[in-house]
A protein has these predicted regions:
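Iron-sulfur cluster-binding cysteine motifs and their immediate structural context
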Residues: 1-8, 25-44, 54-69
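Short, intrinsically disordered, charge-balanced linker/junction segments flanking boundaries
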Residues: 2-9, 195-201
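Well-ordered beta-sheet/strand-loop patches within structured domains
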Residues: 11-13
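Cysteine-rich micro-motifs
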Residues: 18, 46-53
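Conserved active-site region of classical short-chain dehydrogenase/reductase
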Residues: 24, 53, 105, 109
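Conserved AdoMet/S-adenosylmethionine-binding subsite of the radical SAM
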Residues: 74-201
Length: 201
């Protein structure tokens, strides 16, 4: 999913209300007071949460899980290389997705460079909504760009996704000038947003 407007870059606490018995143990164990129940419903304040996982560890019903984790480049590549035989057999490789991989451009470039040194095919799912300098930095290490282009109208794009349409077009033009064969442009068709015939055809 290359939709950074819908993704958090931090680990996320998930609550399964089917398992929860509203015992309030999680609320009582949270040192940041990031959890409370209101009218029997679980509420989590992500701004206050520091990810300590006290609530997860104390929940006797396993109704809480923390998803997402910080990983060093070496750990990511170690996971990727577990499937190296499969990549070799299938002519596959590694695809960086998100959110938006370019949000962490320094780490992305480091991992891409190491992946290329290990002989891996690299692909990136992207919205193109970041500085051209970041793209220029990473582009030499990317074999394929899966470029999501959500709307041609800059105002509508800004209104619904907070994206910079001019920047997205500039980055796409740069990539197409570098090597048109490295880019697959995709436009997800979303009812009421970009499904007008003039945009699709």
């Amino acid at each position: 999913c290359a939709n950074p407007e819908t993704q958090s870059s931090q680990p996320v606490l998930l609550h399964d209300m089917r398992k929860c018995v509203s015992c309030h143990t999680c609320e009582q164990s949270c040192p940041q007071k990031a959890i409370h129940f209101q009218k029997g419903r679980f509420h989590h304040d992500a701004q206050r949460c520091n990810g300590c996982q006290s609530c997860v560890e104390m929940c006797l019903q396993d109704a809480l899980q923390l998803r997402g984790e910080d990983m060093e480049s070496e750990a990511i590549l170690h996971e990727v290389m577990k499937d190296k035989d499969y990549y070799d057999m299938s002519h596959g490789g590694v695809t960086f997705s998100g959110g938006e991989p370019f949000v962490q451009v320094t780490s992305l470039c480091e991992i891409l460079q190491e992946a290329k040194a290990l002989g891996l095919h690299t692909a990136v799912e992207t919205t193109g909504n970041y500085p051209l300098a970041d793209l220029q930095r990473a582009e030499p290490f990317i074999d394929l760009f899966l470029y999501d282009f959500k709307h041609l109208d800059d105002a509508k794009l800004l209104q619904f996704t907070h994206g910079n349409g001019q920047l997205i077009k500039t980055n796409l033009a740069y990539l197409l000038h570098q090597d048109v064969h490295k880019v697959i442009v995709r436009m997800p068709i979303i009812t009421g947003f970009n499904d007008e015939a003039s945009l699709v055809y």
